[in-house]
Amino acid sequence: RSTPIKSSAASDVYKRQVYTSEPDTMKMKNYNIQRRGVLIMKCIGIIGAMEQEVAKIKEKMQDVTITSRARMDFYEGTLEGKKVVVVRSGIGKVNAGMCTQILADVFGVEAVINTGIAGSLNNDVNIGDIVLSTDVLHHDMDAIGFGYKKGQIPQMDEFSFPADEKLRKLAAKVCKEVNPEISVFEGRICSGDQFISDKSVKDAIISEFGGFAVEMEGAAIGQAAYLNHIPFLVVRAISDKADGSAHMDYAEFEMAAIEHSVKLTVRMIQEL
């Protein structure tokens, strides 16, 4: 149910967009106002697994209040004039899932953006490139002995969790503006509680799931956001090729990849 919002300017057409909770559509339960096709969010959660992934974002914030929950510090304030909550979740899926649930329960965020770095799963995706999630899944979930597909969580119909299309389209547009020299890919991101640095493991993930990038948090964030009917997007800059060269590549390109991801995230907030 919704009530139309009147606009004093004929050129600015506002409307309430009602989101339902059907699990196959991944629509928001919250009401957002939409103007000229752009979502206007009241509060946006930004998650990075490591301090390096959120430090530069926090430096740009104003009017900051810090709230501690579950050994995580949530920085609540404004960024580019928008209300945000920025947090370092810690590495791994349990940390990431807990962090997302706290953002939903305590701060009532209306969208979640996960920024960070990842390994490439696609030969066309090179170090420094950006991958925007179409969907996310757990590559290390294995309950095939109970009749489920590999990657599928038992007692859940969903095999993967779809990211928000509007957020993804905005990110793709923004990336071309702020990082025109960087290639942007839209595709599946696979998550597991392991750093992939073995080509045989990488090849097995590709064979089973496809995908464009592999990392350690996105699927947990996507699952928690999905179950709370909150739109999400995972933004990953590629730091390594997820093979035998991964450790060497990661050390060399980590900070440059983080810079790309942070730059894109901040500009997205500006336009939301």
Residue ranges, per PLM feature:
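Short, Lys/Arg-enriched N-terminal segments with co-localized hydrophobic residues
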Residues: E22-I40
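Alpha-helix C-terminal capping segments
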Residues: I102-V106, D124, Q223-P231
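A C-terminal functional module that forms or caps the active site or interfaces directly
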Residues: Q194-D243, H247
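His/Asp/Glu-rich mid-to-C-terminal helical/loop segments that flank catalytic regions of hydrolases
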Residues: A242-L272
